[in-house]
Design a protein with these regions (language model features):
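Amphipathic alpha-helical recognition patches that constitute DNA-binding helices
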Residues: 12, 16, 77, 81, ...
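Basic, amphipathic "hinge/linker" alpha-helix immediately C-terminal to the N-terminal HTH DNA-binding motif
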Residues: 75-94
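A positively charged, amphipathic N-terminal helix/segment that binds anionic biomolecules
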Residues: 1-2, 80
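Basic amphipathic alpha-helical segments that dock to polyanions
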Residues: 51-58
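N-terminal helix-turn-helix DNA-binding core of bacterial DNA-binding proteins
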Residues: 6-50
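Amphipathic alpha-helical dimerization/coiled-coil segments
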Residues: 88-116
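Short beta-strand/turn micro-motifs at beta-sheet edges
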Residues: 3-7, 68-69
Length: 116
């Protein structure tokens, strides 16, 4: 099965970013993309052209904050962190996804165990 670009999954990229930051803590942009790829078993690939505009939208909404951090290699990297507002937003999004997933499983006559 081929990969899916997370930016092509309309309306999901921001939720995936927020959830990744919530689960793993502050990360730089490449770390966010790697987290999404790793957690999806490589199925979702986030390109820079989708990732950074999404991070900027999340920052504009107050869901993400950032700071410059000096890396082990001595370079500066922008690290993103989920805010309290971002935590509330991702909690709301997750409720919707859980509801939609249950409905899809029912429509497809599948159990949660069958899709694990």
């Amino acid at each position: 099965m081929g990969g899916v670009r997370a930016g092509n999954l309309y309306g999901t990229l921001e939720m995936l970013i927020l959830r990744g930051l919530e689960l793993s803590g502050p990360m730089h942009g490449v770390g966010v993309a790697d987290h999404i790829s790793s957690r999806s078993g490589g199925l979702f690939q986030v390109e820079e052209g989708s990732l950074y505009p999404a991070l900027h939208r999340l920052q504009a909404k107050g869901h993400v904050a950032w700071e410059w951090v000096k890396t082990e290699e001595g370079k500066r990297a922008k690290y993103y962190e989920i805010t309290r507002s971002g935590r509330r937003a991702v909690a709301q999004e997750l409720k919707g996804w859980i509801s939609s997933t249950r409905a899809m499983l029912s429509l497809l006559d599948l159990s949660a165990e069958e899709v694990r």
